[in-house]
A protein has these predicted regions:
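Iron-sulfur-cluster electron-transfer modules
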Residues: 16, 35-45, 78-283
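Ferredoxin-type iron-sulfur electron-transfer modules and their immediate structural context
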Residues: 1-103
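C-terminal amphipathic alpha-helical segment
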Residues: 297, 305-344
Length: 438
């Protein structure tokens, strides 16, 4: 079934469609294209040769080899290029179809740009489609709820301020049984770094906060975590196209670090949040660079290892493979440092084929996993190529330093019955490092 013929039931897409008049659609499109974009879209539309080279890059296209509607250029033709051709004169039903494609058939992983002979940035164009849809109120229900949470609480999981602090205190108390004297310092001024995480950690994965605190304690790090709203470094608004709220989130995050007078921000193992903090948020706020330096966990662990601050008792013996998160590898070039860290920790590393910047996306990124259950089957069908890639390694452990990648890979592993499991770098370091004898 071609992507235009498939209808995914989503209450917010339908509600937004019902409220979108032709006049409002045209006005919103023209306001965005003239006020925010300039000539960039027109240049891409005119330089794209419709050659189909991008089809070799897209996991959706490779997973549906007999259906040309899944190629990136076809998706552009059905969305942003259609918007430009029609000068924004589209009806509500057409916009609903465009919104569905933009939120289901592109993870904005940017693998395709490596294959395009003229460098058309398809991910940017699809994010522009989402921007238009967001201003029309045609955004999937589940991801819009996370954006609403950002607006109300400055985190994506509706975590209250007291719940956040309680989670940190709880993990500190738990860790003291294993690491006497350990602290999770709150609002410590002048520390070397502020450690920031995404909201799913206090909500679902509190053990990762425990592990990070243990690693920093054993490494002798001078660190802190903020207690006030702005602690969550994630950003679903970047994916919905609500750039105004994206800017507010990033400003709040950096202002916390500035108030604490830390030297830099160390971010947990999340890809999209890292990109939002070091790239998207800065540009939307018209900052030349981050007001406080930002380091991803991959790079920070690499530093600790090279400085001899992490000591392990043994290496992980079972064979592992490395998944390359799009936003830290294609987007930031941390492939070598990731491999240095994994090879330090693991005795037997089997590379995926392809790997590094050519690795396939997990199909969770770009906010697609956050669109929720209605979109899950499409996500699974659209990444058969990743399942094949994982299966071909012959291993049972996947090292993936990204939250969304864990969610996407775990879904793929279960759906295709691969018999594998995922690990964060922090999982491995905590498991293998020297610990005090209590």
């Amino acid at each position: 079934m071609g992507i235009e013929k498939r209808l995914i039931e989503d209450a917010n897409l339908t509600r937004g469609m019902q409220l979108a008049t032709p006049e409002r659609i045209t006005k919103v499109i023209r306001d965005v294209l003239k006020g925010e974009v300039g000539v960039r879209v027109k240049v891409y539309e005119q330089t794209c040769m419709r050659c189909g080279a991008c089809a070799k890059a897209c996991h959706f296209s490779l997973s549906h080899p007999d259906d040309a509607s899944y190629t990136p250029v076809a998706k552009l033709d059905k969305t942003i290029f259609k918007i430009v051709r029609e000068s924004g004169k589209l009806n509500a039903e057409q916009m609903r179809g465009i919104a569905q494609i933009a939120h289901t058939e592109c993870n904005m992983c940017r693998r395709c740009i490596h294959y395009c002979p003229v460098g058309v940035d398809i991910a940017y164009l699809m994010s522009l489609v989402r921007r238009i849809c967001n201003k029309l109120g045609i955004t999937p229900t589940f991801i819009q709820d996370t954006a609403n949470s950002h607006s109300a609480t400055f985190n994506q999981m509706w975590v209250r301020e007291d719940e956040w602090i309680d989670s940190l205190v709880w993990q500190e108390e738990e860790a003291r049984e294993e690491f006497p004297g350990i602290r999770i310092p709150l609002d410590k001024e002048g520390a070397d770094f502020m450690y920031s995480v995404i909201a799913p950690e206090p909500k679902f994965r509190t053990q990762l906060i425990y592990q990070a605190a243990a690693i920093f304690h054993q490494a002798g790090s001078d660190w802190t975590m903020p207690s006030r709203p702005g602690w969550d470094n994630s950003d679903m608004c970047m994916f919905t196209g609500d750039y105004e709220m994206m800017g507010r989130i990033k400003r709040a995050h950096f202002e916390l670090a500035q108030k604490l007078r830390v030297k830099r921000i160390v971010m947990g193992e999340c890809g999209h949040a890292f990109r939002s903090v070091y790239d998207q948020g800065n540009r939307w706020l018209a900052w030349k660079d981050s007001p406080v330096p930002v380091v991803h966990a991959i790079e920070f662990y690499w530093e600790l290892i090279n400085e001899g601050k992490i000591k392990i008792t043994h290496q992980f013996e079972d064979p592992v493979t490395i998944h390359d998160p799009c936003n830290t590898i294609r987007g930031r070039g941390l492939a070598d440092k990731l491999r240095d860290v994994v090879h330090f920790l693991c005795a037997n590393v089997v590379e995926m084929t392809p790997n590094r910047e050519h690795n396939f996306c997990c199909s969770a990124g770009g906010g697609i996993i956050n669109c929720g259950p209605p979109f899950k089957s499409v996500r699974m069908e659209g990444n058969r190529v990743k399942a094949d890639q994982l299966r071909n390694t012959g291993v049972h452990t996947v090292v993936a330093p990204c939250h969304n990648c864990h969610g996407g890979l775990e879904d793929i592993i279960k759906h295709y019955k691969l018999g594998m499991h995922t690990k964060f770098i922090g999982d491995l370091i905590y498991e293998l490092m020297e610990k005090p004898e209590v």
